[in-house]
Amino acid sequence: MVLASIFAWLCMSAHADLSFDGQNRFVMKGKRLPITLVNEGKEPALAEISLDWGTDGTGQALPFAVSRPLLRLGAGQRAKVEVLYQGQGLPTDRETYLLLSVLDVPHATGKGDALQIALRHRFKLFYRPSLKATVEQAMAGLTWFYDPEGSPRTRNPSPY
């Protein structure tokens, strides 16, 4: 019980200095997606930005690049990073689910006995190609039904 209390106390004092301008997911509708990173801490921070397939992966290389995969942010500083799509390699008839990963490495304090924890932020990123159907057409195509347990379900045949 004492060990659990100590661990809970340590976890409460940890916080992330990087924020993402209030975003918790991103939708990419073109070939570029600007992302704003903000260091809200009082010390510089290092951010490592990468992308990965959102599902279990296809074994293929991602057709994306990050403009600044490693970035140093001073205290209170804002910076823009762009996710760039090369224009081919993804389905054009539906959304693609990706994961945007940002590793927040804190500044070394210089104090002898200090525990520094790097935090990894993972965000959903949806690549949405320009689709021929409208959102209204997609909504009209939804079918609603109850499953055998009595829970309401919907079937969505549209690419949205």
Identify the function of each model-found stretch.
Residues 46-50, 54-70:
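Short beta-strand and strand-turn-strand segments in soluble, beta-rich domains
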Residues 88-132, 136-137:
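Terminal connector regions
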Residues 9-13:
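N-terminal signal peptide c-region/cleavage motif recognized by signal peptidases
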Residues 15-38, 134-153:
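Beta-sheet-dominated interaction scaffolds and their linkers
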Residues 33-39, 83, 98-103, 151-156:
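Buried hydrophobic-core signal for structured, non-transmembrane domains
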Residues 2-4, 14:
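Cleavable N-terminal signal peptides
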Residues 42-47, 157-160:
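Short acidic/proline- and small/hydrophobic-mixed sequence motifs that coincide with surface turns
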Residues 61-90:
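Intrinsically disordered, low-complexity Pro/Gly/Ser/Thr-rich segments with frequent PxxP/GP/PP motifs
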